[in-house]
Amino acid sequence: VQWWPAFALIAVAALSPSAIAAADPAVPQPGTSCDASLGDAMTWPDGTAPLACTGGPTGYQWSTVDSPYPVSARWVSFGPPMKLHGEGLRNAAIQSGDWTATPLDPDSRCGAEQIAVVPGVGAGPPRDVEGEPGRPLSLQVVPLLFSIEMTGDCLWQKVSP
């Protein structure tokens, strides 16, 4: 029974505030506040309707997007993968071109997995890219994009037409 104190120490460490603080940020909900720096950015939490960070008399908050086919040049990912469809399908949510992903927290790492449509073949192989913690990531969203999974607590902005 000499292992019991070590097990108890590990359990306490796993539940400590620093371990909890390292968890993915909370996924936004309609009506919750968002930072003004995210104004006009959108997010699309898995299994929900897309949200936009909109400003008003009470400040900035996440609002449900009315359009069934939202498209934006600014997206926010919050840790868990956010999957969007590109120009390889009808009603793309993200356009191809040069993008920059900026971590919203110094420990966050932005990453993306892209799958393009290959004419006559179907979906091509995944193309992965990942930035360093706290550092912006520059990437090209490929033409004929089928899907992209964005990860990290990051603001993604299109920088070219």
Report residues per predicted region.
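Secretory targeting and sorting signals
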Residues: V1-D24
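Generic detector of ordered secondary-structure context
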Residues: A13-L15, P45, N91
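Surface-exposed ligand/attachment interfaces on beta-rich extracellular proteins
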Residues: V76-I94
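Generic detector of short, well-ordered, non-transmembrane alpha-helical segments enriched
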Residues: P17-A19, A49, Q95
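Primarily secretory-pathway and cell-envelope proteins
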Residues: A22-R74, P106-P161
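A generic structural signal for solvent-exposed, polar alpha-helical segments
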Residues: L9-A13, P68, P81, D105
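A short tyrosine-centered beta-strand micro-motif
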Residues: G97-A101
